[in-house]
Amino acid sequence: MEAALIGFGVLLLLILLRVPIAFAMGAVGFFGFWYVRGSLPAAISTAGDRFALLIQTESYDLSVLPMFVLMGNLVARAGLSTELYAAAQGFLGHRRGGLAMATVVACGGFAAVCGSSLATAATMAKVALPSMRRFGYRDTLATASIAAGGTLGILIPPSVIMVIYGLMTEQSIRELFAAGFLPGSIGVVLYMLAVRWTVWRDPAAGPRAERVPWPQRLAALKGVWGVLALFALVLGGIYFKAFTTTEAAGIGACGALLFAMLRRIGWKAIYAVLVESARTSAVLFFILMGALIFSNFINAAGLPEGLLQLIGGQGTPPYLVVAIILLIYVILGCVLESLSMILLTVPIFFPIVKGLAPELGLDPRWVLIWFGIIIVVVTEISLITPPVGLNVYVLSSVVPDLRTTTVFRGMVPFIVVDIIRLAGLTLLPAISLWLPRLFYG
């Protein structure tokens, strides 16, 4: 166990020195495994196995990752966010704080076909912020609603983070997608309540916009048919077992391409999306390979088993163990980027949680699905908390005159409702597990 702790410390040091995480995890995992096993051939064999896993043709299931990345990039380029925001604004804009609520709803809808928090936040900033500024919204509320709404991109399926978690823990991606839908919907409602609370305290923060006549509202709904159709096709097919998650990813990417062509997106733009998606997927696969090598080292060094024995020997209540794990995630989220945090910690914590399944009163089949959802929610919180808060910095890059301190000041009520949601999902696993049990019981 000592070797694993030393390796973990070395890995954190390499990350702080800005060594690319894929190489840092791969190097620490390789040399750590060599040290633990005392055999260079064994270390080379393990690294080779991890590499082969990602390139062998029979592992076509891994294509789910680049396909969902491609779908999200095509949807973002096709401009669906504008129609989503227009429809939500038509129904909510006339209320106090209504444009911020419309932003949250539009973020939820965009997340359902995008799968990336950063892309959701960046795209919605270009669409929603000019409108809210035009009606006199305070920047604290306007930008906070975009940054918080953007976090829904990794929880409402399809989600790239969920795919990575599923690959690392060998869990069903379709069950993870089913488990994320209800918590994501709850997140939309709670963020809207956070907006209501903000404008209740300060009515000038979110003035009313003009009321949109019903004919215009219904006309605006016609603009979101593409999102609804793609969402129903991909997730409906997965949930009702019409096709596998891998097939759904391919169908979703084809559907997004067709929709982009119908929107008259030029071939040059489509080529740029393909290149961007290929680069992103290559980076993710290298990171995943490094994470798998590091995971092998952590397991060989006995860190999860050692921690589990330490916890069991102290008679620590299982939910207190989970609470400590979540606290560690919150602390790490303040200094680490979200993907790095998940890749670093999941290999350590998921065997512990799996071992605690009987004490938690959960079926071993479902415990890691539940754990995956609460990990994603913690990751959402890390995306909007200082000092790292990637969604906040994405907003600052999209809106040059925006100060990050302005966004962080407005984030407090959204972080509070996120913590409430996290507590509810942790103490009531049935919230996350109801849909996957219903569909795949």
What are the functions of these language-model segments?
Residues 1-441:
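Alpha-helical transmembrane segments of multi-pass membrane transport proteins
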